Amino acid sequence: MYWKDYYDDDQPIIYVAGPYNAPTEMGIMDNIRKACEARDDLVVAGWAVVCPHANTANMDNENPDIYYRMDVKILARCDAIYMLHGWENSPGARMEHEMALEWGITVYYESGGVPQRRASADGLSKFA
């Protein structure tokens, strides 16, 4: 097995954004589950996916600023962001949406379906 067999420099990176916190522990787990389901759908569609919900699941939730700082650095390196249903009610997801717009990162919304990665005539991947 050789790493170059798996590296695709043209594969776009997409960031999953949506609610994390909820009034109950079960609500938080449900939000993590929804984000991970979206992550899985995006992987199947051909994206390299960053899902912060999975990165911070079950971690100390007392100081979200630590995670926001980490997420901002990761989002800055992404080609696109995928906004889950309910993102408008999440302070963190609203911040990520605003950053994506300011930085010119392509924004997709769950209501529009999973964006498909497609090949162009020259064989390079493009956003669908």
Predicted segments, located by residue:
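Conserved catalytic or regulatory cores that recognize and/or transform ribose-phosphate-containing ligands
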Residues: 1-128
